[in-house]
Amino acid sequence: MEKPLTVLRVSLYHPTLGPSAFANVPPRLQHDTSPLLLGRGQDAHLQLQLPRLSRRHLSLEPYLEKGSALLAFCLKALSRKGCVWVNGLTLRYLEQVPLSTVNRVSFSGIQMLVRVEEGTSLEAFVCYFHVSPSPLIYRPEAEETDEWEGISQGQPPPGSG
């Protein structure tokens, strides 16, 4: 009996190019346990033709954690010029971070949401891709407040005396 594959559900969004940025992305991609490369190069498993994207921009790398019988994943930055933002962390060239169940990734103008659904197969995993019509990542902007206007001007700041 075949073991169920681990599933990565990947939503993609680009703010200016929209869905056309992902015209060559298949709806489903099954892959063995080697790193899945994303970039604009011919050797990338997921090819995106975007100007700021490196030929090998990032990889999704399956691995086995000690004591676990399930595939885990990390995301590795492969671009020497650009950086990759993952769940609030900025990754530079060859830095990597383990993925959790839900992950927010941003690079080269692309927003990507990756959901990991565990399966028991150790031979392969499958990615399902969805192009989102709206932003996937919201970074709150700093708000201006009147907080400082209520402080008396005659008092020295704390720690200055």
From Swiss-Prot:
Pfam hit, one: FHA
Swiss-Prot/TrEMBL GO biological process terms: auditory behavior; cellular response to cAMP; cellular response to Thyroid stimulating hormone; cochlea development; cochlea morphogenesis; craniofacial suture morphogenesis; genitalia development; genitalia morphogenesis
Coiled-coil stretches noted in the UniProt entry, renumbered to this chain: none
InterPro entries assigned to the protein according to its UniProt record, in alphabetical order: FHA_dom, SMAD_FHA_dom_sf, TIFA
GO cellular component: cytosolic large ribosomal subunit
Domain FHA, residue spans: 36-91
Superkingdom, taxonomy of origin: Eukaryota
An example Gene Ontology molecular-function term: deubiquitinase activator activity
SUPFAM superfamilies assigned: SMAD/FHA domain
Function text: Inhibits TIFA-mediated TRAF6 activation possibly by inducing a conformational change in TIFA.
Record note on quaternary structure: Interacts with TIFA.
Descriptive protein name: TRAF-interacting protein with FHA domain-containing protein B
Gene source species: Homo sapiens
Primary gene name: TIFAB
